[in-house]
Curated annotation (Swiss-Prot):
This is S-methyl-5'-thioadenosine phosphorylase. It is an enzyme of class 2 (transferase). It holds the Pfam family PNP_UDP_1. GO terms for cellular component: cytosol; nucleus. The keyword Ligase does not apply. It catalyses: S-methyl-5'-thioadenosine + phosphate = 5-(methylsulfanyl)-alpha-D-ribose 1-phosphate + adenine. One of its GO terms (molecular function) is S-methyl-5-thioadenosine phosphorylase activity. It comes from the Eukaryota. Homotrimer.
Length: 289
């Protein structure tokens, strides 16, 4: 079982270890040096695939394919709890992830990159917490505040990485996560726009929630692959267009993630890491993770 010390005031530099969660094209182990596979079992079952541990520029990193390396796990069936638990268990302090999404805004064009800052959860079948009352879960009930939803400092690292590489990126967006695997109806797509959604995908929730509950600093790079189906007079989203646009832009995301790893490693994150853990402790009743 994982444990977090709720009153740890030791602010000596804490070594960072960065988890990278990717989809198709972003689970390439060649970005890691000195790589080794590690198979992990968790109290919540098996992760999507083996963890691949290694280094990027001398920085300890762990790669995990969200949908498995064969991309044979649909979004509803991803074991998000096992994925996050496994990455936390091997010592990750940060998670930087990629996600394909549809655009709900004219100005976010297919092929554009976006750093989401908030979410709307429309999933229906997914476990949202480690504190589920089972014999192997942490004790208590965690009422986790989800503002801010993402680690602002990690988000800013990703934004600065894109700027240094001269890769245009939208710096804010609210992402709607639907259950899938189907795409939205037109009425749903229009409704999400009215709600303030800018992007739509199938994986951010509960991944971002569980990462925060595990005390990890989470940031995401989203690739807009299509306009969903809200635009009148236009064909809706289809898988072939999604895959084509994703493949055309995946190298840009890889460059941003690699650059961000180096930037994260240059800074002292001790206070952020301890504050993230303290947030969990402060909002857990009758126990701590």
């Amino acid at each position: 079982m994982l444990h977090i010390k709720c009153k740890d005031t030791d602010l000596d530099p804490i070594p960072v270890k960065i988890g990278i969660i990717g989809g198709s094209g972003l689970d390439d182990p060649d970005i890691l040096e000195n790589r080794q596979e590690k198979v992990i079992s968790t109290p919540y079952g098996e992760p999507s695939d083996a963890l691949i541990q290694g280094e990027i520029g001398g920085v300890q990193c762990v790669l995990l394919a969200r949908h498995g390396r064969k991309h044979d796990i649909m979004p509803s069936n991803v074991n998000y709890r096992a994925n996050i638990w496994a990455l936390r268990d091997v010592g990750c302090t940060h998670l930087i992830v990629s996600t394909a999404c549809g655009s709900l805004r004219e100005q976010i064009k297919p092929g554009n990159l976006v750093m989401p800052h908030d979410f709307i959860d429309r999933t229906t079948k997914r476990s949202q917490t480690f504190y589920d009352g089972s014999a192997t879960s942490p004790r208590g009930v965690c009422h986790l505040p989800m503002y801010p939803a993402f680690s602002e400092r990690t988000r800013n690292i990703l934004i600065e990485a894109a700027k240094e590489l001269e890769i245009p990126a939208h710096e804010k967006a609210t992402i709607v996560t639907i259950e899938g695997p189907r795409f939205s109806s037109r009425s749903e797509s229009l409704m999400f726009r009215e709600w303030g959604g800018d992007l739509i995908n199938m994986t951010t929730c509960p991944e971002v929630v569980l990462a925060k509950e595990a005390g990890l600093l989470y940031g995401s790079v989203a690739i807009a692959t299509d306009y969903d189906c809200w635009r009148m007079g236009c064909e809706g989203v289809n898988v072939q267009d999604v895959l084509k646009t994703f493949a055309e832009n995946v190298i840009k995301v890889k460059k941003i993630l690699v650059n961000a790893v180096g930037r994260i490693a240059k800074e002292d994150w001790s206070e952020d890491i301890l504050n993230a853990k303290q947030c969990v402790c402060n909002n857990t009743m009758s126990g701590a993770m």
